[in-house]
């Protein structure tokens, strides 16, 4: 997966509908359901049907950077816009990005491990104060950062979501909880989508089953 070098500003790229995104190549990813066996909640394991998890089957990803900031645009089909909890089984739509915090080959389906933690960027349609930056060292171990270095904006229309994440390539002051990126470098990367109308939340979601390698154009 290529992260294209662009000359546009963060303000421009944060708009999911910006014309600047039309020149950034995209890659379509097949999404799989998270395994029920990996859910930390016994209630979830007992109450969910594995065949009903992972409603979103395909995700389009575009990546770009301007030498200072990195941007990801995630788009997927969704015939319903869910922006709040409206029933016991209806939750807000969301999406996320997963990157190994310290390199290595963490188990993507288990949210990393003690020796190989992962950094997750999380957007959800109901979060009024912005996205979340988290670190995980295995299932059920997610810790939210007090300070989030990420910006995100999502729009829904014509039966689809488009969400853009933006962050400085380097966040040296948060090196223990935010992956450091640089032009010419490469990292493993994964993605997740939560379909709220399908009762998806927490560990119940669609995800990219294998790591992809993201190469940042020099």
Residue ranges and their predicted role:
Residues 65-68, 102-103, 156-161, 181-185:
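A short, structured loop/turn motif at beta-sheet edges
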Residues 2-41, 84-157, 198, 202-218:
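Extracellular/luminal beta-rich ligand-recognition
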Residues 45-57, 145-148:
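Short linear interaction motifs
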Residues 16, 69-76, 161-167:
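Short, well-ordered beta-strand segments enriched in hydrophobic/aromatic residues
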Residues 64, 73-75, 98, 155, ...:
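Residue-level recognition of well-ordered beta-strand positions that form the cores
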Residues 21, 29, 59, 67-71, ...:
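Primarily extracytoplasmic ectodomains and periplasmic/lumenal surface modules that are beta-strand-rich
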Residues 159-202:
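Ser/Thr/Pro-rich, low-complexity mucin-like regions
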Residues 36-44, 75-79, 168-170:
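Generic short beta-strand segments
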């Amino acid at each position: 997966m290529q992260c294209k070098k662009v000359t546009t500003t963060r303000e421009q790229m944060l708009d999911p509908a910006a014309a600047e995104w039309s020149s950034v190549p995209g890659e379509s990813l097949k999404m799989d359901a998270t395994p029920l066996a990996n859910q930390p909640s016994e209630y979830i394991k007992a109450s969910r049907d594995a065949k009903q998890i992972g409603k979103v089957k395909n995700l389009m990803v575009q990546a770009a950077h301007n030498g200072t900031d990195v941007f990801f645009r995630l788009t997927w089909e969704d015939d319903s816009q869910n922006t709040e909890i409206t029933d016991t089984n209806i939750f807000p739509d969301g999406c996320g990005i997963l990157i190994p915090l310290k390199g290595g080959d963490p188990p993507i389906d288990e949210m990393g491990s003690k020796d190989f933690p992962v950094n997750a960027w999380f957007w959800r349609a109901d979060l009024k104060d912005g996205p979340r930056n988290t670190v995980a060292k295995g299932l059920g171990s997610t810790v939210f950062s007090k300070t989030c270095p990420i910006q995100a904006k999502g729009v829904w229309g014509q039966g689809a979501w488009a969400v853009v994440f933006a962050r400085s390539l380097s966040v040296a002051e948060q090196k223990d909880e935010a992956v450091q990126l640089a032009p010419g470098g490469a990292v493993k990367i994964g993605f997740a989508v939560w379909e709220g109308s399908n009762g998806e939340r927490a560990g119940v979601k669609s995800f990219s089953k294998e790591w992809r390698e993201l190469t940042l154009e020099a």
